[in-house]
Amino acid sequence: VGASDITLQTGEPVFAESYGRLLRITQRKLSNTEVSETLNLIYGPNGSAQILSGVDIDTHYEFRPNRNERYRFRVNATGCLVEGHDAIQISFRTIPSTPPKMSDLNLETPLIDALAPEQGIVYVTGATGSGKTTLLAAIIRDLAEKEDSHRKILTYEAPIEFVYDSIAMPSSIISQSEIPRHLPSFAAGVRNALRRKPRLILVGESRDPETIGASIEAALTGHPVYTTLHSNGVAETLRRLVNSFPAEEAKTRMIDIIETIRVVIWQQLVPSTDGQRIALREFLVFDEKLRDILLDSKLENISAHTRLVLKKYGQPMSVDAKRKFNAGLISERVYKRLILRTEIAEHHDEI
């Protein structure tokens, strides 16, 4: 069925998601014992017990039916209530065994040219399932495959998704560590990286002030850092980064954020006219001139000011949406919905 996600839940049949449509792929409902035993097989004998204790599980699972085939999944297991009893839902997200090539992602030329900074931070943002990890994996593959790359690449992920075993790397080496299996947190991962002389650090998600702060420190000391963030837009990304810190630190941190930022990409996957999904991107490449412009911003105006800079120097989401609508790749309904969201966000900045 070309499924991207598979869901097992106590008291329900098996569901699969294919191009945004949820499909029932079995008639029989699963018992709690079946779901628990499946989780224990994937995670270990204490998997279901951990769920019952109120702690969810994020991990990966790999299945090899033979030497030539390999299937990988990102797995989340969470406790839930079904008919008044404790139950479990397991979500499997399929991961291609080989990272994609950047040439397969139809990235814009100005963006491609900016994705290998010598130092500073590249933020890839968007909702869950918007292709952030896929884009980062393509960037890493592209850099690692270069004959003269000479990069020690360290990744810290929760869980590890794409692997690079099948990629020819003439002059680079990749080490992937899983949080919390190998290190307790993303922030600990960044601190670990600084002791290993890397030429590229990937931080799976900047979800807290400690991780964001550690990534900034790594960038300030001359390292290129790539990370993801859950935000909706370039302007929203800067606002979220600044607001993640206590109010008394916000002004100083805003300066550090702007000094270290190199690229922000906001990506969405939307329905395409061929029944599949297509990536739309908003992005801004922060050169020295743009960083100087934003350093003059007042703290409370950073989001609105960034949006003005984006319109003049970057690619707003509305521009990419219009391009793909004119090319017949997305429907008028999808296009109008995206434009409406953009107008609402801009109105919010003006309030």
Regions found by a protein language model. Give the residues of each.
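Short, flexible helix-loop junctions that flank or precede catalytic/ligand sites
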Residues: V1-I351
